[in-house]
Regions:
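Signature for the C-terminal beta-barrel architecture of outer-membrane proteins
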Residues: 1-108, 150, 155, 172-176, ...
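Solvent-exposed loop/turn segments connecting transmembrane beta-strands
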Residues: 28, 142, 225-229
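Repeated loop/turn-to-beta-strand initiation elements of outer-membrane beta-barrel proteins
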Residues: 44-48, 90-94, 159-161, 166-168, ...
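Short glycine/threonine-rich loop-to-helix capping motif typified by GTGT followed
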Residues: 66-67, 182, 226
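C-terminal structural cap/anchor segments
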Residues: 92-188, 192-193, 197
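Conserved C-terminal beta-signal and adjacent last beta-strands/turns
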Residues: 150-153, 167, 195-215, 240
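Membrane-proximal extracellular juxtamembrane segment immediately upstream
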Residues: 206, 210, 214-224, 229, ...
């Protein structure tokens, strides 16, 4: 269990993009995060993990639609993951994960003050400070979102001198909005289905102090995405040298 206080000391009031009749705003956002989690094993082959977080505090309302005022924040997020260990020479494992973060139906943006919470209403949009696996190519903010992920990884050549430490894996993710009419990272319709994604990766420790990492993700937009429906691609090639 944990508690974390986020106190906003930012005094900047200027809008990044001034709007007609509006050049500044109050961006105060002060919340307390209360979380509880658990992890462990179920027998020899199953691992589990779970976490639930509540975000409680105060925010400033959207300055565009009405005069700003202070509103309450009450938002939630959670994660559940289960892993099956095959116990083979390839160290193969399969994973399933579900994530959710609440959204707010009167927000136009899931995280910003501008186009944010409507004055006089409870802000239910979760504002994440941690990491959640929301894909390589899509990778939206963890707010007004629920996802399902299935993945598998293995070391395919355990007897090879050169490729003994090569791990390969794949994840398939499905993305949906929690609030169909709520704001999101990008322009969306009132549909809930954001899309799906396939991520492939390889981690190869060539020597004790040098490793290569490859990542590729492709996101297929769903019916909720208002922009172009072309597939989005992400490629990463990284090298790590340890001293």
């Amino acid at each position: 269990a944990y508690a974390l206080r986020m106190q906003d000391y930012n005094t900047d009031t200027a809008l990044r993009t001034p709007l007609p009749g509006l050049t500044d705003a109050n961006f105060d956002y002060n919340t307390t995060y209360l979380g509880v989690g658990t992890e462990g094993s179920l027998g020899a082959d199953w691992l589990y993990l779970g976490e639930v977080v509540a975000s409680l505090g105060e925010t400033q309302s959207d300055p565009v639609r009405t005069i700003q005022q202070e509103d309450d924040v009450e938002a939630y997020a959670g994660r559940a993951q289960i892993t099956y260990l095959f116990r083979d020479r390839n160290q193969t494992r399969a994973q399933g994960e579900a994530l959710f973060a609440t959204g707010d139906k009167d927000r136009l943006s899931s995280t910003d003050t501008v186009n944010g919470n409507l004055a006089g209403t409870l802000d239910r949009a979760f504002n994440s400070l941690g990491f959640a696996n929301t894909g390589l190519a899509f990778s939206p903010s963890f707010s007004n979102l629920w996802t399902l992920r299935a993945g598998v990884s293995t070391f395919p050549m355990p007897d090879s001198v050169w490729f003994q430490q090569l791990q390969v894996g794949a994840d398939f993710l499905v993305f949906n909005k929690m609030e169909a009419a709520g704001g999101f990272d990008e322009t969306t319709s009132n549909d809930m289905f954001l899309g799906s994604e396939l991520d492939l990766y390889a981690n190869w420790r060539i020597t004790s102090d040098f490793a290569v990492n490859l990542r590729y993700g492709v996101f297929f937009p769903g019916t909720a995405i208002a922009g172009p429906d072309d597939a989005r691609h992400f490629v990463l090639i990284g090298c790590t040298l340890s001293f």
